[in-house]
């Protein structure tokens, strides 16, 4: 349930910066090969760090 709250907070931030989306989309388009081994390794590393963060966050709130 706390994951949904985190996603809601992120969506709230996106709404405030949504005014300049038309200009930013042109600059932020990237062609990322999702099947590349280095992309998969990066995704695993990011997910691992996120899980550690969530575990630490859950432990400190109790």
From Swiss-Prot:
GO biological process: positive regulation of CAMKK-AMPK signaling cascade; positive regulation of neuron differentiation
Superkingdom of the organism of origin: Eukaryota
Single GO MF annotation: calmodulin binding
Key words of the record: Calmodulin-binding
Domain IQ: 39-62
InterPro entries referenced in this protein's UniProt entry, alphabetically: Calmodulin_Regulator_PCP4-like
Result after altering residue 35 to A: No effect on the calmodulin modulator function
Gene Ontology cellular component terms for the protein in this record: cytoplasm; cytosol; nucleus; protein-containing complex
Chain segments carrying region Disordered: 1-39
Compositionally biased residues, Basic and acidic residues: 12-28
Region (Acidic): 28-40
The keyword Chaperone is assigned to this record: no
Comment, domains: Mostly intrinsically disordered, with residual structure localized to the IQ domain which mediates the interaction with calmodulin.
Role according to the record: Functions as a modulator of calcium-binding by calmodulin. Thereby, regulates calmodulin activity and the different processes it controls. For instance, may play a role in neuronal differentiation through activation of calmodulin-dependent kinase signaling pathways.
Family the UniProt entry places it in: Belongs to the PCP4 family.
Subunit note: Binds to both calcium-free and calcium-bound calmodulin. The affinity for the calcium-bound form is 50-fold greater.
Name of the protein: Calmodulin regulator protein PCP4
Organism: Homo sapiens (Human)
